[in-house]
């Protein structure tokens, strides 16, 4: 569509697999699955939207139950505690958006060692601590596309500001 060229410029080819492996994961084909989503924090628009998308996908699949749970502030220690508690409960999968890519790795490895599938989104961990990481686009591609779009709209001498947060 016209006007969406910037959105596709940041896309890249699929990356080769670089993740860890669960140990002794049981064959769950056709059986009920319990998955927990532990984002950086709960109660904000972005993670409310990802949670809704996961709920919608679970409903489509039919045999998946997804629970979104996590800290109300972006706190890695609390996030680790949530994941550890769900490992103890015996979930089949952990979805996460890491508050700290290194600090979260041991609890994710613990999940893998327990045969639990681990997938990150939005904010990665170290690769060996999860199976897959899903990201919307690469940051440098998004940034380049945004600046290219700005220049196309305003010219190459326009003034602009950048606002960011964590």
Regions found by a protein language model. Give the residues of each.
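A residue-level marker of the well-folded mature domains of exported/periplasmic proteins
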Residues: 1-166
């Amino acid at each position: 569509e016209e006007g969406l060229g910037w959105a596709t410029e940041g896309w890249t080819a699929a990356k080769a697999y670089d993740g860890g492996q669960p140990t002794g994961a049981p064959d769950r084909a056709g059986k009920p699955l319990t998955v927990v989503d532990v984002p950086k924090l709960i109660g904000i628009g972005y993670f409310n939207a990802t949670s809704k998308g996961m709920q919608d996908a679970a409903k489509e699949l039919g045999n998946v139950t997804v629970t979104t749970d996590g800290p109300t502030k972006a706190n890695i220690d609390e996030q680790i505690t949530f994941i550890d508690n769900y490992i103890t409960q015996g979930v089949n999968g952990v979805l996460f958006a890491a508050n700290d890519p290194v600090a979260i790795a041991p609890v994710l490895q613990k999940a893998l060692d327990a045969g639990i599938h681990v997938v990150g989104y939005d904010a990665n961990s170290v690769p060996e601590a999860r199976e897959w990481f899903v990201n919307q686009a690469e940051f440098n591609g998004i940034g380049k596309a945004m600046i290219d779009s700005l220049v196309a709209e305003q010219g190459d001498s326009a003034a602009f500001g950048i606002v960011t947060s964590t």
